[in-house]
């Protein structure tokens, strides 16, 4: 006969976040000793975290606090929408914004109330039963607009964008910058301006464009113009200021911003499961 009650099992679950069967087994093994049961669960959790390390954390959410953005990954969308997972992400991004860290590595090495963030994530992994990864963290200075996108109403945000801007910084300016953040979320630019594209990337695009044109048997005299056109198409696809604006596809983003009196100086885009 067990020397603990259903209320004891519930209390242990509430205290540790462990499942009902795990809590019951721990109390049975501990012969009703509450502190020993907690220790048993902590040991089991630590072992399970090690087993989970080889699994893939491809789900999760993007959280923000003011001018900071964070991506926290888990294994299933079921966990991604739980209150405890959402709360952990929010706690971490708020701490990151306050503490002055600038990367996920720095955030993991920092402490919350004396406990290391890496240890806190590992503890939550043990409680939840899935591999958790604090994948990315970024923070911008100055005036910043934010946009978060949900891929389904019952899921937390999976895409997050921060846009740092100058110029018109009133309510209208914020609306314009947020519109650009929505463009970034949807169109996935990799660079802000042509000047930000590494020279080796441009050169690679030129080589590919020329090789493709030759394989298509294009006239030799036409190659320079064809190559230039295809490189410009690359810029229009991957450079924010060169993209067609989603609000007016007859104008590039740079023209829309110039007319609005807003200048984008930097942006950050996180999407769950993508680099």
UniProtKB/Swiss-Prot annotation:
Region (Involved in Mg(2+) ion dislocation from EF-Tu): 76-79
One GO location term (cellular component): cytoplasm
Main location: cytoplasm
Keywords for the protein's UniProt record, in alphabetical order: Cytoplasm, Elongation factor, Protein biosynthesis
Cytoplasm as UniProt keyword: yes
PROSITE patterns the record matches: EF_TS_1, EF_TS_2
UniProt keyword Protein biosynthesis, yes or no: yes
Spans through the membrane: none
GO MF assignments: translation elongation factor activity
Pfam families: EF_TS (PF00889)
Intracellular or extracellular location(s): Cytoplasm
PANTHER family with a match to the protein in the record: ELONGATION FACTOR TS, ELONGATION FACTOR TS, MITOCHONDRIAL
Family: Belongs to the EF-Ts family.
Function: Associates with the EF-Tu.GDP complex and induces the exchange of GDP to GTP. It remains bound to the aminoacyl-tRNA.EF-Tu.GTP complex up to the GTP hydrolysis stage on the ribosome.
Protein name as it appears in the record: Elongation factor Ts
Organism, scientific name: Salinispora arenicola (strain CNS-205)
The gene coding this protein: tsf
């Amino acid at each position: 006969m067990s020397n603990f009650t259903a209320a004891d099992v519930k209390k242990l679950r509430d205290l540790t976040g462990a499942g009902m069967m795990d809590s019951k087994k721990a109390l049975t093994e501990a012969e009703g000793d509450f502190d020993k049961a907690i220790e048993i669960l902590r040991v089991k959790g630590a072992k399970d975290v090690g087993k989970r390390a080889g699994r893939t954390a491809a789900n999760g959410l993007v959280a923000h606090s003011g001018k900071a953005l964070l991506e926290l990954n888990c294994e299933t969308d079921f966990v991604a929408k739980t209150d405890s997972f959402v709360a952990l992400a929010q706690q971490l991004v708020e701490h990151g914004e306050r503490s002055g860290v600038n990367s996920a590595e720095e955030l993991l090495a920092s402490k919350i109330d004396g406990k290391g963030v890496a240890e806190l994530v590992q503890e939550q992994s043990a409680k939840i039963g899935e591999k958790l990864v604090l994948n990315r963290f970024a923070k911008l200075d100055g005036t910043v607009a934010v946009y978060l996108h949900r891929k389904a109403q019952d899921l937390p945000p999976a895409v997050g964008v921060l846009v740092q801007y100058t110029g018109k910084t009133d309510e209208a300016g914020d609306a314009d910058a947020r519109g650009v953040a929505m463009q970034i979320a949807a169109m996935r630019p990799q660079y802000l301006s042509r000047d930000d594209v590494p020279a080796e990337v441009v050169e690679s695009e030129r080589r590919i464009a020329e090789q493709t044109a030759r394989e298509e048997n294009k006239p030799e005299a036409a190659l320079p113009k064809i190559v230039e056109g295809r490189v410009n198409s690359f810029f229009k696809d991957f450079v924010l200021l060169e993209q067609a604006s989603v609000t007016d596809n007859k104008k590039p983003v740079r023209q829309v911003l110039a007319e609005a009196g807003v200048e984008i100086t930097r942006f950050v885009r996180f999407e769950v499961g993508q680099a």
